[in-house]
């Protein structure tokens, strides 16, 4: 039988991001050509949020306004953290007080071809994972 606490590392205890957590949405984004970590991150966030609707959220937010919603984005990126445009990622989220946390993760794999006309520097595909947490 698996020892889940050891497998999951148990590193995230006592998280104080929000008092009330409503949603955690998961997404994946890739940049197939061009090795652009920001493009992959934006696609991951879009993938996480574009399959959801939260029509009752205003009714539980303080003062009934989306301005009081807190949104935390966790991005697992494989490389080029210094090239990640966090402000561009934040613009994908239309409402709330947005924070972004970047951690090591994601994936690099080969596309099998280098396409200079697509700004390829090599044959790597950049894959980013995103967790978008919504609460107040």
Stretches found by the model and what they are:
Residues 4-17:
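Short, Lys/Arg-enriched N-terminal segments with co-localized hydrophobic residues
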Residues 15, 62-64, 91, 121-123:
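Sterically constrained small-residue positions within well-ordered secondary structures
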Residues 18-61, 76-86, 126-136:
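Conserved mixed alpha/beta catalytic, RNA-binding, or beta-rich assembly cores of soluble enzyme
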Residues 62, 66, 112-115:
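Metallocofactor- and cofactor-centric catalytic cores in central/energy metabolism, strongly enriched
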Residues 66-68, 127:
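Short connector loops at helix/strand junctions that flank enzyme active sites
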Residues 70-114:
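Mid-chain, well-packed structural core segment of small domains
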Residues 98-136:
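C-terminal edge-of-domain segments
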